[in-house]
Amino acid sequence: MAVQQKRRGLSFIDAKASNVKKIAVMASTVAFEFNKATLRLRRSLHISPRSSPEVQRKATAGENSEVGSPESSLSTSRCSKRDRKLCAELSSFALYPIFGALSPSHFSSPNLLFQSEKNSSRRSFEFMQLPDTDICQIMSFLDAQSLLNLSQTCSHLRQLCLAHEDNAGKRDVTSHEITISFNQIHRRTEVRLLKRERTRTDRQFISNNIRGVLAPFSRALTKITFETTVFVTDWLDEILQLHRENRLIPLSLLFTGGALTKGHQVTGADLRSITETEFVDFVTKLQPHLQEVQLSTSRIFKISTDPSQLLGMISMLSSFGIVYERPPLHFYHEEISNAIALWKSDPLSRCCDVYMRRPHDVSSESWIKLAGSIDESRIDPYTDEVLVSQITIKHSFLVHIDLVFHFH
């Protein structure tokens, strides 16, 4: 009996010693793998250990302050990345003795991290090689600015963005302007999207309609310029449609080309197919964003309303001009007085600069009666009459809101 108990005690001691030996072997393995992973990471990141001859040489030369200092080339992000790699490396070989036999497909070797990196590098391919469905799924995780940048890389991605732009938000873009001109060589009207502060090397977007030049996932807050010989009525419906879709917000409308008029040969953007009432209604629908309208064209619509509705737009604009029209348009004192009275009584009026021809029947005393101050005037060399060039009128109850007339 005593012999059996002694054997049992010896077997227990042997079992205990065996467990201790296993733990010691596992601890040695962990320490070995830890040192191996540390050396590998130091080698990949080009970090020398403190005990290396290079570090000791720098320390003796007075450069020891650079080692481990916050101003070293190794940033915090790289340190955290190194720590994550080290933890992944340690977790891979620490879990391998336990789960390696149970799940060899997931724990095929202790060096899982670097093996997966090698496999992924062999499977890498370019972004444009992805199917369109995968690219669209990636686009669903991007914000409006990232989608806008993606659409400006190439035509293929631009078309994909255009096909899925209804499912994302819009970003305001103010860096470009739209120009509609007639190409004399190809005999067609073209729409161009140009940078506001551009050079000759900047890229241009050209299309036969306004929608084709607008960037996907954007809302264009822009100036629209109609150049000479362009029929404006062909573009009004598209502008209103894009405005309703919240894709286009015109801030300024410029109708140019009137300066090229010589004698009876009128030039400029063609507004003769639209009436005065239709034009005022078009400007009203673009409020409250539209700030400027410049009618610098000779091909203007006829003033058909009495009194004219054209001057009434000064209450909703910040700048309004009507020059180069043929035949010359001169407003009368009564029409100007009514427009000023409407502007002074409107609580939504803005500061506005009006550029127009000098009226014939308005004297300096008449401007003063309208509560205006004459800023600039000159003497007519032929009649010795005082000609008012600029006048400023204050608002009735809004402070720092002025109406300035510039006459020519």
Swiss-Prot record:
InterPro entries tied to this protein: F-box-like_dom_sf, F-box_dom
Polar residues bias locations: 62-77
Presence of keyword Coiled coil: no
Region called Disordered, residue ranges: 49-77
PROSITE patterns (alphabetical): FBOX (PS50181)
Domain F-box: residue ranges: 124-170
Highest taxon above the source species: Eukaryota
Protein name, entry field: Uncharacterized F-box protein C27F2.7
Organism encoding this protein: Caenorhabditis elegans
